[in-house]
Design a protein with these regions (language model features):
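NAD(P)-dependent short-chain dehydrogenase/reductase
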Residues: 1-31, 35, 63-64
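A conserved catalytic-core signature of glycosyltransferases
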Residues: 18-19, 49, 105, 112
Length: 151
């Protein structure tokens, strides 16, 4: 959704306070699953990320770069605007019977200012070491989207 928006020259962000977030690429998730099957403790939960903390703008900047740096307008709206948009999304979804990407669950995720994951226990217990940082994961994802005709 964000890549499509940026390819259409709009980067939409929510909230005026800094947002720190972590990311994990799907291939690193698969690695962690296999490591958990081999070395994980029953009932134990493991956090995953690429080991770095990013600002939300880092993500959109990397998407823009992978798309060839199209011109864009960055719009930052207050959190209450997101609440209205997700409420409308929920109403439309209920009335049409379709799932909305902009719903109350998404609101609760996007309004948070800190999504930092400590992967040290995962690294120590499982031997997990991420192979993809955000830049590499975004570049590979955008290439895949283009090849599949999604962008």
């Amino acid at each position: 959704m964000m890549a499509k928006s940026i390819s259409n020259h709009i980067d939409f962000a929510v909230g005026f306070q800094r947002q720190d977030i972590t990311f994990v690429y799907v291939k690193d998730v698969v690695q962690a699953i296999f490591l958990t099957l081999d070395h994980g403790m029953n009932g134990r939960k493991y956090f995953l990320s690429d080991g770095n903390v990013y600002r939300s703008s880092d993500f959109s900047n990397l998407i823009r770069k992978a798309l060839g740096n199209p011109w864009w307008i960055r719009i930052t709206a207050p959190v209450w605007v997101l609440r209205i948009v997700t409420s409308i999304g929920e109403l439309v979804a209920r009335s049409t019977g379709r799932i909305s990407a902009l719903n109350h669950d998404k609101f609760n995720i996007l309004r948070q200012r800190n999504w930092r994951c400590d992967i040290e226990p995962t690294m120590d217990e499982l031997g997990y070491h991420p192979h993809y940082d955000l830049a590499r994961g975004v570049a590979e994802t955008i290439d895949w989207y283009k090849n599949e005709g999604w962008l």
